[in-house]
């Protein structure tokens, strides 16, 4: 089960979970600019200053299979024990893909296409979202593109061990980014609510997400958006992710 640490400034509490990464080799998966822009880099630089950290950001938005191959090769060469993803949906997907393929990179493409069971690499996954949209930190799915085809991996092994939801980290996103991300969360909540696979629990999560979107989405688009609103949208995205994690996606999600 994923442990969620939620609150404004919560990333600074990572130090309280040092047992998860102390004296271990950490693969830090990040975006090229968002890691610094969000303020996460400055916080983690202090917390992880004495740790053995290897950063990987050599991949595109909506990761391609070739990107994942490079990530796995980098992680295996570093002999990592922990994966820490700091970023949006593509960053989190990349971290999940590296974990999924870590033990069996030679057969990774076949695993994706055949939906084979994944081997457990015994690597912890810590996730810090810096966008409020995909809810990927709450799901057991990862998306990868092979050529022009979009594939989805699904395994309980892809659920993070620990997630930090910190509204401060999305404060530097542009209004356009926040609008796109917010509509992503809203759409996922609606999709989950009417999905054939919905349950009483998933519907509860979906409606929590919808209520938070209604309350906070207009507010986060303002230049002086308060942390409360930013954090509210981060929680909305997480609830939408928890909902879709249960109900699964519908045809609309293929685009």
Per-segment meaning from a language model:
Residues 3, 25-27, 54, 81-84, ...:
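Structural motif
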Residues 72, 91-105, 138-141:
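Short Gly/Thr/Asp-enriched flexible loops that form oxyanion-binding sites at enzyme active sites
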Residues 60, 86-88, 248-252:
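Active-site nucleophile and cofactor-binding loops and adjacent substrate-binding regions
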Residues 103-200:
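A glycine/threonine-rich phosphate-anchoring loop and its flanking beta-alpha core
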